From Swiss-Prot:
Belongs to the complex I 20 kDa subunit family. This is NAD(P)H-quinone oxidoreductase subunit K, organellar chromatophore. It is found in: Plastid, Organellar chromatophore thylakoid membrane. NDH-1 is composed of 14 different subunits. Subunits nuoB, C, D, E, F, and G constitute the peripheral sector of the complex. It catalyses: a quinone + NADH + H(+) = a quinol + NAD(+). The lineage of its organism: Eukaryota, Sar, Rhizaria, Cercozoa, Imbricatea. Pfam families: Oxidored_q6 (PF01058). Binds 1 [4Fe-4S] cluster.
Length: 246
């Protein structure tokens, strides 16, 4: 009678004395994680980004919607801070003017390293619709501080802000401690210690007295102007409800 396969398997297991996986190894693999110092440091930072909210226009309203329960941005570890010395991320949302530029630069310089910047909205990235007519709007916040991530839109939706935060977390996770000194900006367009050179006002009207404009002005003066106009009938209403017609 030929034994069954199950019987052979049981006989082999009882006589061969197979060496199994040690229980100590299983316990260690479930309680110890092997990683590098860079990965551990980056994991701790990307899971606890503390943003400093710098909102000057309508883009900040969209970011304020993230605080509500519908989007719940706390799940990303974002804890808004009111002090730049406790923040490692600044989100610039809205138009930046020349008068607000020193305040923005001072806030950035007060943040500890490593620090990151998200430019949110078209007005922050390029100046937006205000840059065409306004002479005081900064045409790009990257002229003041280095930007790590650009978030276009007018304004961006809250879902786009989440996507920007996720991309920034990926960037933080790929950094190395040895390369941190090489990633610092080497040139700054504007700093707090920078002294602006005062110049004369641009709009003074002196260009009309230039020689290149004299021919056009003389041609305009020679044009006849008709000041004669027929008198239009007027009607005067008095306080005693009487009217006089001319």
């Amino acid at each position: 009678m030929t034994p069954s396969i199950d019987a052979l398997r049981d006989f082999r297991a009882s006589t061969c004395n197979l060496v199994g996986t040690p229980t100590v190894t299983n316990d260690l693999s479930e309680n110890i994680i092997l990683t590098s110092l860079d990965d551990l440091h980056n994991w701790a930072r990307l899971s606890s980004l503390w943003p400093l909210l710098y909102g000057t226009a309508c883009c900040f309203i969209e970011f304020a919607a993230l605080i509500g329960s519908r989007f719940d941005f706390d799940r990303f570890g974002l804890v808004p801070r009111s002090s730049p010395r406790q923040a490692d991320l600044i989100i610039v949302a809205g138009t930046v003017t020349m008068k607000m530029a020193p305040a923005l630069v001072r806030l950035y310089e007060q943040m500890p390293e490593p620090k990151y910047v998200i430019a949110m909205g078209a007005c922050t990235i390029t100046g937006g619709m205000f840059s065409s007519d306004s002479t005081t709007a900064v045409r790009g916040v990257d002229k003041l501080i280095p930007v790590d991530l650009y978030l276009p839109g007018c304004p961006p939706r809250p879902e786009a802000i989440f996507d920007a935060v996720i991309k920034l977390r990926k960037k933080v996770g790929n950094e190395a401690l040895r390369e941190r000194g090489k990633l610092l900006p080497t040139h700054r367009y504007f700093t707090v210690a920078h002294k602006m050179k005062q110049v004369k006002p641009i709009i003074t009207g002196t260009y009309l007295r230039a020689k290149t404009q004299q021919n056009a002005l003389q041609a305009g003066v020679a044009l006849p102007v008709d000041f004669k106009a027929e008198a239009l009938p007027t009607k005067v209403i008095l306080s005693n409800s009487l009217s006089l017609d001319n």
